[in-house]
Design a protein with these regions (language model features):
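N-terminal active-site beta-alpha-beta segment that forms phosphate/nucleotide-binding
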Residues: 1-98
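Conserved phosphate- and dinucleotide-binding cores of soluble alpha/beta proteins
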Residues: 61-168
Length: 168
């Protein structure tokens, strides 16, 4: 019999939490891309007691209702589970023009958050989906009218990192 998506994300979260517990060490900066998989990890991982941890976002937030995954909530719950300091990134993942992007990236708060992102030692990201049919459908084709039309400039994201993440 097949598992429902919630149960599958929960099971993945338990295993990912065990793995994360085995690799995270004192002082790590853990970057995450909050989504359903990371939410499953946060909801199902054990409490972790390490000192000096920071949790930060690796990309901005999507504000459209159909993609809203409560990024702030996931990030802060993740930080609590790790006894870590949260470092949110209050910026959209896409903006409509390059001038707006430049304005955002010049903001001192953004520069501070981005500096933390660049020092990440562990990255927690979801890859694909937990259900078979969804992995073959691109985001623009999931819901009519939800393509990122007019999106001209990404504000911050994993693709802009100069560091390379390696397996420990």
């Amino acid at each position: 019999h097949s598992l429902g998506a919630d149960q599958l994300y929960g099971n993945l979260g338990v295993v990912a939490g065990q793995y994360l517990k085995s690799i995270v060490k004192r002082g790590d900066i853990i970057g995450c891309v909050p989504g359903r998989g990371v939410a499953g990890l946060v909801d199902n991982m054990p409490q972790l007691e390490r000192t000096g941890l920071t949790v930060t976002q690796l990309m901005g937030s999507e504000s459209r209702r159909e993609y809203n995954l409560e990024v702030d909530s996931i990030l802060h719950r993740f930080a609590r589970k790790l006894s870590a300091l949260p470092q949110p990134l209050y910026a959209p993942v896409l903006v409509s023009n390059a001038e707006l992007r430049e304005s955002i990236v010049r903001e001192p708060y953004y520069q501070e958050a981005y500096a933390v992102m660049k020092r990440c030692t562990v990255a927690v990201v979801g890859i694909g989906t937990a259900t078979t049919y969804e992995q073959y459908i691109t985001g623009a084709n999931r819901q009519p009218g939800t393509a990122a039309a007019g999106a001209a400039a990404p504000v911050g994201g994993v693709h802009s990192f100069q560091n390379s993440f390696t397996h420990r």
